[in-house]
């Protein structure tokens, strides 16, 4: 059975949730063993697929789950703002580690390897390709190249201030243009994830709201502090 068919069956059976297991770098949760535990728990809870960063994490997760895994490698480059799977060798390493789908930065920014070359390498290995995009133009370009999935992953992260809400409009526009859209980026509530489906998303990736304890704790702390200040001001 193909990876795409397997993923589609998981979506039909349990829903269209992809869980991104990426701890805050340097946090107490940032170890392959903990990432593997997160991924296993997400799989047991009904996730349709997983998104895993880094070869060590992917190698730790792969023996424990049969779900399709979207693999990425993040790098901080001096010569380019592109961070997600920027090199051909990253694709080779992710394939070797067990990724079924490989995601790469699909934006039109300066980069060490052309998008066409990255996609060709993914296809050479017989894997599915996901383009992490920031705009309609990015998504349509990568769709024309032949990417299997178009993610809204980088919307709001390439310039200016990052908004609080997900980019539902981009999901809708890409879906209307015929893209198989994976909504990603700031989907912090179940209601937002469901809204993405109503806008045409094929699946929804959720990360921080499920697997980043620090972020979730900060959300609660900020809300409680704001209410406490409001109550104090009222007196």
UniProtKB/Swiss-Prot annotation:
UniProt keyword terms in alphabetical order: Carbohydrate metabolism, Isomerase
Name the Gene Ontology molecular function terms of this record: N-acylglucosamine-6-phosphate 2-epimerase activity
Q: In which pathway does it act?
A: Amino-sugar metabolism; N-acetylneuraminate degradation; D-fructose 6-phosphate from N-acetylneuraminate: step 3/5
Task: Report which residue ranges the record marks as coiled coil.
Answer: none
Gene Ontology CC annotation, any one: cytosol
Q: Does Isomerase appear among the keywords? A: yes
Q: What is its EC number?
A: 5.1.3.9
Q: Which EC class does it fall in?
A: isomerase
Q: Which reaction does it catalyse?
A: an N-acyl-D-glucosamine 6-phosphate = an N-acyl-D-mannosamine 6-phosphate
The Gene Ontology biological process annotation of the record reads: carbohydrate metabolic process; N-acetylmannosamine catabolic process; N-acetylneuraminate catabolic process
List the NCBIfam families: PRK01130.1
Q: Which family does it belong to?
A: Belongs to the NanE family.
- Function per UniProt: Converts N-acetylmannosamine-6-phosphate (ManNAc-6-P) to N-acetylglucosamine-6-phosphate (GlcNAc-6-P).
Q: What is this protein called?
A: Putative N-acetylmannosamine-6-phosphate 2-epimerase
């Amino acid at each position: 059975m193909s990876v795409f068919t397997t993923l589609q069956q998981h979506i039909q059976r349990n829903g269209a949730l992809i869980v991104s297991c990426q701890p805050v770098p340097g946090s107490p949760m940032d170890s392959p063993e903990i990432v593997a535990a997160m991924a296993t728990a997400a799989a047991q809870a009904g996730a349709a697929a997983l998104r895993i960063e880094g070869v060590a994490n992917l190698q730790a997760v792969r023996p424990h789950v049969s779900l399709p895994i979207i693999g990425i490698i993040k790098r901080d480059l001096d010569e380019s703002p592109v961070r997600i799977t920027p090199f051909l060798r990253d694709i080779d390493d992710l394939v070797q580690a067990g990724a079924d789908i490989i995601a790469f930065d699909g934006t039109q920014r300066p980069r060490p390897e052309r998008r066409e070359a990255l996609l060709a390498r993914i296809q050479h290995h017989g894997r599915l390709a996901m383009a992490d995009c920031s705009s309609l133009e990015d998504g349509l370009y990568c769709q024309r190249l032949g990417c299997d999935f178009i993610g809204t992953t980088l919307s709001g992260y390439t310039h200016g201030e990052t908004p609080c809400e997900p980019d539902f409009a981009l999901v809708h526009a890409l879906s209307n243009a015929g893209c198989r859209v994976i909504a990603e980026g700031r989907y912090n509530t179940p209601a937002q994830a469901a809204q993405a489906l109503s806008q045409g998303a094929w699946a929804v990736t959720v990360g921080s709201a499920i697997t980043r304890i620090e972020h979730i704790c900060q959300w609660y702390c900020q809300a409680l502090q704001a209410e406490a200040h409001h109550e104090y001001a009222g007196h």
